[in-house]
Amino acid sequence: MHMKPIYVIPLAVIVVLIIADQIARKRSIDKATRLYASGRFSDLVDYLDSWYPRLFYMSYIRQRMKFKAFEAMGKTDLAEDCLDLLFASSPAKAQLADLLIQAFTFYMSSGKFKKAEEILARIEENPDLKDAAPELRKVYEIQAKGDSSHIEEMETQVSKASGADALRLYLLIAKQYENKGDNEKADFYRAKAKHVNS
């Protein structure tokens, strides 16, 4: 059975429009990625507020990109506003787990320990993050509360660690020695961390 020409033309137009839309979306995402990668964070925010991303990006993705840009620019208040919008958007289960980790990291690095503790409580209640929660609790206690009770444990762990794990452990050990007032040991472990990072 052959389709009548009158039906073939609209079908062809629809297919062309779908392909054109997919190409436009890919180019748009590529442009946003390039702006971020090249450190043009202000330009990225302007682009994300332009008509095409506002119309065609999922709101969650657009806000997340803006959060990352504001965080990179050091605009803490604007980044925090984006986080509030992201949490208010009722993210999917996997998105929420990722968002909680990002929010915890952001608040800890910004020195907003009260907010970090609130997020940590949510992390500890989230079954998808049960493996990460104890380690994040240690990070919080070390950085926000001046804890130094994990030195021996972490020194044992770091002897078998490499890459990002070793870097994280060296920095946490250094912070604990700093908390104890042993600046010589703190400097020693910071130097080790710098060596891993180079």
Would you name each region that the model predicts?
Residues M1-K31:
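N-terminal signal-anchor transmembrane alpha helix of single-pass membrane proteins
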Residues A20-D30, L55-R64, A92-I101, P127-R137, ...:
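Generic helix N-cap/helix-start motif at coil->alpha-helix transitions
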Residues S38, M73, S110, A144-S148, ...:
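Structural motif corresponding to the intra-repeat A-B loop/turn of tetratricopeptide repeats
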Residues L44-G74:
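Acidic, Ser/Thr-rich low-complexity segments on the non-lumenal side of membrane proteins
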Residues D30, R34, M65-A72, T105-F106, ...:
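Residue-level signature for tetratricopeptide repeat
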Residues Y170-S198:
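Alpha-helical oligomerization segments
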Residues D43-W51, T76-A88, K112-P127, S148-S162, ...:
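Alpha-helical repeat scaffolds
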Residues I29-S50:
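Short juxtamembrane segments adjacent to a transmembrane helix
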